[in-house]
Amino acid sequence: MIEAFGRTDVGRRRKINEDSFLVSPEASLYAVCDGMGGHNAGEVASKMAIETIAAFIERSGVEKEITWPWGLDANLSFDGNRLKTAVRLANAKVFQAADNREELTGMGTTVVASIVTGKSITIASAGDSRCYLVRGGELKQLTRDDSWVSAALGEGILNSDDVEHHPLRNVITKAVGARDSIDLDIVQHELQPGDLVMLCSDGLHGMINDQEISRILGAGDAPLEDASARLIEAANESGGRDNVTVVLLRQPA
């Protein structure tokens, strides 16, 4: 059975933790959401998204006659369709809550969510929360940031040296609840024995770079509780400007 552990920390600068995460081995579901919005609305958005995603994934795993509100996408696997529908349901719920309650206006959340079935991992993402893979001591980012700097980098407007300190580095171009509909990035990868997968908010990768993350995770064989604690400690020691959340999964060797 896959090994998993999650940890979150408010960081050094914030008073409220607006990140939420889920570790559910029973549903083979793992997720990180990084909420945004004033008056604690980000905390509401991230929790609402996690709860909505979990509810649909759990139901779709056991109910044969479940309703698919937007139908099924023939280009996606069953798990891909489950994640796509779950996040779209979360988007609708967060958007409606923000529209109905003045104190929640403008709230939203990033999401990175994964289902592990056998040797396959399916990942859905929106925003700048990330999924990484450590295999053979090598770190690889499996998701693409939905952010202004990522788009500018892809279009050649910026180079990689500009990104780390760019004033728009925290501006995301996609979030759950920001609009009445959402397009998701969904990818699928085959896992190998001993692979380590990490889901994280930008409170981690925005404070320490990939080289430092790779150094801390090493070969990916350290106890997950220890590795997550070291990652969060490093983010906080680098300034801790944001909430930081890490979920680690390890495929049995």
Where in the sequence are the language-model features?
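PP2C/PPM-type serine/threonine phosphatase catalytic domain
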Residues: 1-253
